Swiss-Prot record:
PANTHER family: ALPHA-1-ANTICHYMOTRYPSIN (PTHR11461:SF145), SERINE PROTEASE INHIBITOR, SERPIN (PTHR11461)
Protein name: Serine protease inhibitor A3N
Region (RCL): 367-394
Expression across tissues: Liver.
Gene: Serpina3n
One record GO biological process: cellular response to cAMP
């Protein structure tokens, strides 16, 4: 009988003051140095572009399935967890995972990918003064399952994966063990990650990310008021609306994509990019999401005086069963009886049965807490006679990024902040 590996992914985030992971911690412009045997290097900008490509590809799949719902997830959390699985995958199973994560295996060898992730996660685990970040992996292994020592050692060395034994025949106790661990690691933000646990389960892989930061320019709670938010054709909903006046912050108006882009910075090396499509233009902006678009926006941002900025205060969450979505990105074999995960047990007796991802994003006055060129025209404020007022009173996108590497650990669409 084929045993099942249940892969659980977790992510939590808040968006008012926050930090991002990758290079905010890196003082170098590469994620890892040249290997003694190979001359291949994966620089941070390339890794950021690859991560962004995966993020936008997955986002489009999730948004298409839920066009009138909030979307929030951590592409970094998901890719790191799948990369751990790829450590034990062989042949086509391994290639599908890494290529599904948008890596080009002819340009970047598998060993360099793992080394890059390992270096990144190691840097992220270092304590920060201005931002709280916690990220890691945990393996919950059926006590009767024999896992190769080499796999456990690599998972621990590269991905800081802790290993625990569990009795999945006692599903209630095993579920509590895992959920309690996740709750503790995410400061209580993620509760009940696993709701169902099959008795055939042999292993559960949990990835978590938690971060908390503060806005560089915080909102004054005394200025927050009830205002209307317009979600499509529905009647507007009342939401707490935060307000900033006379704010100097990076801004650009994209005339080609019909959207406004504003960057709000956190204390530390992180920022949140808010993309506000014009009325009825959300699908146009979503269809154009790709690494080049994000790069163009960031290159075009200029410090500008915004007379009034309105942003809803919100807390949103989402749960995803990604085993139904990842095959659309080319990751198929690991979910079938053709899966080759022999690098985990030494036998081809494992397959992935479930990939669960849960994200929480809170945006408030003080900050964010988490447990996730052509056509771009900058309009100089000196040329504007009318005051610049930007109101996020309709669906918008939010991308949390590291300001040094441009990696986006969290991506969200706020369709209804209430």
């Amino acid at each position: 009988m084929t045993r099942l590996v249940t892969l659980e992914l977790l992510m939590a985030g808040i968006g008012s003051a926050l930090l991002c992971f990758p290079d905010c911690i890196l003082g170098e412009d590469t994620l890892f140095h040249e290997d003694q045997d190979k001359g291949t290097q994966l620089d941070s900008l390339t890794l950021a572009s690859i991560n962004t490509d995966f993020a936008f590809s997955l986002y489009k799949k999730l948004a298409l399935r839920n066009p009138d719902k909030n979307v929030v997830f951590s592409p970094l959390s998901i890719s790191a967890a799948l990369a751990v699985v790829s450590l034990g995958a062989k042949g086509n199973s391994m290639e599908e995972i890494l290529e599904g994560l948008k890596f080009n295996l002819t340009e970047t060898p598998e060993t360099e990918i793992h080394r890059g992730f390992g270096h990144l996660l190691q840097r992220l685990s270092q304590p920060r003064d201005e931002i709280q970040i916690s990220t890691g992996n945990a393996l919950f292994i059926e006590k009767r399952l024999q896992v190769l020592a080499e796999f456990q050692e690599k998972a621990k060395a590269l991905y800081q994966a802790e290993a625990f034994t569990a009795d999945f025949q006692q599903s209630r106790e095993a579920k509590k063990l895992i959920n309690d661990y996740v709750s503790k690691q995410t400061q209580g933000k993620i509760q009940g990650l696993i709701t169902n646990l099959a008795k055939k389960t042999s292993m559960v892989l949990v990835n978590y990310i938690y971060f908390k930061g503060k806005w560089k320019v915080p909102f004054d709670p005394r200025d927050t008021f009830q205002s209307e938010f317009y979600s499509g054709k529905r009647r507007p909903v009342k939401v707490p609306m935060m307000k900033l006046e006379d704010l100097t912050t990076p801004y650009v108006r994209d005339e080609e994509l019909n959207c406004t882009v504003v960057e709000l910075k956190y204390t530390g090396n992180a920022s949140a990019l808010f993309i506000l499509p014009d009325q009825g233009k959300m699908q146009q902006v979503e269809a154009s999401l790709q690494p080049e678009t994000l790069r163009r926006w960031k290159d075009s941002l200029r410090p500008s005086m915004i007379d009034e900025l309105y942003l809803p205060k919100f807390s949103i969450s989402a749960d995803y069963n990604l085993e139904d979505v990842l095959p659309e990105l080319g990751i198929k074999e690991v979910f079938s009886t053709q899966a080759d995960l022999s690098g985990i047990t030494g036998d081809k007796d494992l397959m992935v049965s479930q990939v669960v991802h849960k994200a929480v994003l809170d945006v408030a006055e003080t900050g964010t807490e988490a447990a996730a060129a052509t056509g771009v025209k900058f309009v100089p404020m000196s040329a504007k006679l009318d005051p610049l007022i930007i109101a996020f009173d309709r669906p918008f996108l939010m991308i949390i990024s590291d300001t040094e590497t441009a990696i986006a650990p969290f991506l969200a669409k706020i369709f209804n902040p209430k």
